[in-house]
Regions:
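A charged, amphipathic alpha-helical module
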Residues: 1-68, 96
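Cap/lid and interdomain-hinge subdomains that line or gate substrate/regulatory clefts
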Residues: 1-21, 175-196
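Domain-level signal for soluble alpha/beta catalytic cores
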Residues: 22, 28-30, 60-68, 165-168, ...
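Hydrophobic alpha/beta core scaffold segments
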Residues: 47-51, 71, 75-78, 91, ...
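Active-site cores of enzymes that catalyze phosphoryl transfer or operate on phosphate-rich substrates
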Residues: 81-98, 106, 194-195
């Protein structure tokens, strides 16, 4: 679509000019788990407030193989198999209910591949899969020297954990564990009353 080309031109122009999103990049993070549906600005806020660059998100790692993109009789037949494969490997089934390898081991492989020094772990308070693996994640992150930041939320209800309560968890970790100050203290606390 034309809008994709326009966005790509902006991205390429920024890349050629070596324009940074924030004045400093401090950490490279993998974002793991399912984020709350009501806090969509968190990744952008992490970059600008703390210099944490989110490299990729678990939700974007559904498919790592090529699916047919040309319309041919063979590809039409293959499309059925591709859709079945995607359905088998969707996020909640694959990552959080798909076993130890796809939930835990894959995370460390992505960290190694992308040279991440931090994992932002979304912890949906009702998800028993991630809660049950809490100790495993902690132990393995410590062994690998990767900072693991647990961020609790309720998937669809901002009354349980407000947007600011979510940001405060990261603020507390960065100040107490990392002993860092924000790049931009003015956005450490944001007014959310109109963010519906």
């Amino acid at each position: 679509p034309p809008i994709d080309r326009k966005i790509m031109r902006y991205a390429e122009r920024g890349s050629r000019a070596r324009r940074m999103m924030a004045k400093e990049y401090r950490h490279r993070a993998i974002v793991w788990g399912v984020q709350p549906q009501y806090c969509i600005d968190m990744l952008n806020w992490m970059v600008h407030c703390w210099g944490i660059v989110p490299l990729t998100d678990m939700l974007s790692l559904v498919n790592t193989r090529m699916i047919a993109d040309t319309d041919t009789p063979e590809n039409r037949e293959q499309a059925f198999y591709d859709m079945a494969w995607l359905n088998e490997n969707m996020i909640m089934r694959n990552r959080t209910h798909g076993g130890y390898k796809v939930l835990v081991d894959d995370l460390w492989e992505f960290c190694e591949t992308m040279h991440a020094d931090m994992v932002i772990m979304w912890e949906h308070m009702s998800c028993k899969a991630l809660t049950g693996m809490h100790g495993q994640f902690e132990e393995q992150a410590r062994a690998r020297g990767i900072h693991l930041v647990w961020v609790c939320h309720d998937l669809c209800d901002p009354r349980v954990y407000t947007r600011q309560a979510i940001r405060d968890q990261l603020n507390a970790y960065m100040r107490t564990v990392m002993r860092e100050e924000p790049l931009d203290p003015s956005i450490e606390v944001l007014p959310d009353e109109n963010a519906w």
